[in-house]
């Protein structure tokens, strides 16, 4: 008989025969009847058994969180809180759990995050914890669907590379046979090469690695990056694509994951588009009107971003950043080369992502390399792609975990990562 998922039991007729597999969450043995709470990845159901000698012997031997099989029938006349249960006819232990458990699943014991991460497999069994990742999955799926609808194709680029994407030193070195190599910070260079190849619109979802020695609640050293690049586009086109992709992702999560939001005690609304825009220089004016000193060419501090973000209720763009704080591939503004056709997407004081129109003229690209004091020879495969017809193009890269953290109002990005990699953690 095929397995029945718990969340489909209401679709069955009263009295229908079912087989449920799952974790035995808790058991209550009464005089004549026993009640077991069984959990699978779709929900929890009560199963009731008459206490005949053979059945009672099995139930008494089941440790919490053991894997069990329950055969029985759907009972929609149940007086249980859910109004439905399984009237069990047999139960068997598929795989027994050891006792005691390294981390409680249902008991109201508050463990700190480090303890939870050390026993992550147990932590993820909690409904409110696994809900984060079901929402994250739906968020990503909504973004993917939107990009497909806009004629993007999904690509997969190398994660072992010979040079830094942005020329920095924040790289994890690896030994690639007899050569030195690095884990890629971003698919940026390869996305742009694909514009020269005529792919027109591409996106990638994959790991990115940053060897930055931070240890904050907003940073990871390995994260999931959603990157796009689009031809015959500028920074305004890229911003429109970004805000609509995020809106699509949130719409899908809200539509598909109502129970998960409820289990987290969260109610969210889909953001309206377009998101507000404010230029870098307008931000400076705003800060100075509040009596805050700021020098052109500096990046904004968290406190300064908090001041700026207080003017907005949600997502907003800061545009036209100085060339000095943007990567070499960022297009300068034609009317003021001090500035660039670039943007950061912010949520209050938190940076969500950044993007820009890219340089497409090979001579300007070489000039930008020289300004940033980068060795062109280290990027020859990339530079060559600009010599034979590179279209104007723009794009962005978006961290999935940070977006999820913002959406759910969580205080630590590690909560949105199955197995976080940070300054101190590489296990599990």
From Swiss-Prot:
It is an enzyme of class 6 (ligase). Mg(2+) 2 binds at residues 351, 354. Its cofactor is Mg(2+). InterPro entries: Aa-tRNA-synt_II (IPR004364), aa-tRNA-synth_II (IPR006195), aa-tRNA-synth_II/BPL/LPL (IPR045864), Asp-tRNA_synthase_2 (IPR004523), Asp/Asn-tRNA-synth_IIb (IPR002312), NA-bd_OB-fold (IPR012340), NA-bd_OB_tRNA (IPR004365). One of its GO terms (molecular function) is aspartate-tRNA ligase activity. L-aspartate binds at residues 166, 210, 354, 358. GO terms for biological process: aspartyl-tRNA aminoacylation. SUPFAM superfamilies: Class II aaRS and biotin synthetases (SSF55681), Nucleic acid-binding proteins (SSF50249). Its main location: cytoplasm. It catalyses: tRNA(Asp) + L-aspartate + ATP = L-aspartyl-tRNA(Asp) + AMP + diphosphate. Its EC number is 6.1.1.12. Keywords: Aminoacyl-tRNA synthetase, ATP-binding, Cytoplasm, Ligase, Magnesium, Metal-binding, Nucleotide-binding, Protein biosynthesis. ATP binds at residues 210-212, 218-220, 351, 399-402. Residues 188-191 are annotated as: Aspartate. It is found in: Cytoplasm. GO terms for cellular component: aminoacyl-tRNA synthetase multienzyme complex; cytosol. Homodimer. NCBIfam families: aspS_nondisc, PRK05159.1. Catalyzes the attachment of L-aspartate to tRNA(Asp) in a two-step reaction: L-aspartate is first activated by ATP to form Asp-AMP and then transferred to the acceptor end of tRNA(Asp). HAMAP family: Asp_tRNA_synth_type2 (MF_02075). Belongs to the class-II aminoacyl-tRNA synthetase family. Type 2 subfamily. This is Aspartate--tRNA(Asp) ligase. It comes from Thermoplasma acidophilum (strain ATCC 25905 / DSM 1728 / JCM 9062 / NBRC 15155 / AMRC-C165).
């Amino acid at each position: 008989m095929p397995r029945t998922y718990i969340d489909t039991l209401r679709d069955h007729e009263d009295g229908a025969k079912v087989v449920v597999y799952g974790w035995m969450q808790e058991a209550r043995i009464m005089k004549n009847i026993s009640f077991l709470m069984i959990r699978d990845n779709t929900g929890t159901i009560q199963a009731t058994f008459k206490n005949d000698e053979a059945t009672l012997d099995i139930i008494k031997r089941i440790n919490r969180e053991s894997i069990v099989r329950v055969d029985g029938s759907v009972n929609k006349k149940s007086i249980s809180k859910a109004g439905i249960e399984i009237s069990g006819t047999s139960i068997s232990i598929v795989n027994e759990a050891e006792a005691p458990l390294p981390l409680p699943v249902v008991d109201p014991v508050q463990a700190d995050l480090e303890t939870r991460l050390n026993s992550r497999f147990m932590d993820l069994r909690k409904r409110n914890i696994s809900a984060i990742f079901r929402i994250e999955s739906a968020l990503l799926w909504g973004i993917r669907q939107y990009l497909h609808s806009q004629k993007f194709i999904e690509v997969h680029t190398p994660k072992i590379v010979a040079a830094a994407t942005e020329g920095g030193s924040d790289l994890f070195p690896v030994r690639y046979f007899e050569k030195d190599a690095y884990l890629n910070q971003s698919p940026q260079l390869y996305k742009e090469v694909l514009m020269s190849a005529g792919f027109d619109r591409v996106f990638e979802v994959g790991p990115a690695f940053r060897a930055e020695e931070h240890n904050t609640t907003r940073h990871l050293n390995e994260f999931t990056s959603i990157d796009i690049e689009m031809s015959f586009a500028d920074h305004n086109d890229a911003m429109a694509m970004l805000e609509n992709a995020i809106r699509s992702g949130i719409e899908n999560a809200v539509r598909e994951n109502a129970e998960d939001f409820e289990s987290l005690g969260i109610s969210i609304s889909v953001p309206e588009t377009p998101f507000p825009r404010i230029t870098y220089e307008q931000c400076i004016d705003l800060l100075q009107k509040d009596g805050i000193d700021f020098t052109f060419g500096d990046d904004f501090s968290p406190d300064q971003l908090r001041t700026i973000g207080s003017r907005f209720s949600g997502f907003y763009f800061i545009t036209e950043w100085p060339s000095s704080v943007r990567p070499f591939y960022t297009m300068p503004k034609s009317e003021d080369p001090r500035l660039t056709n670039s943007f950061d997407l912010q949520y209050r004081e938190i940076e969500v992502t950044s993007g820009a129109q890219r340089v497409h003229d090979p001579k300007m690209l070489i000039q930008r390399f020289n300004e940033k004091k980068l060795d062109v020879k280290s990027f020859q495969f990339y530079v060559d792609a600009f010599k034979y017809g590179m279209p104007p193009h723009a794009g962005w890269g978006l961290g999935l975990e940070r977006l999820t953290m913002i959406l759910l109002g969580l205080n630590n990005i590690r909560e949105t990562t199955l197995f976080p990699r940070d300054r101190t953690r590489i296990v599990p």
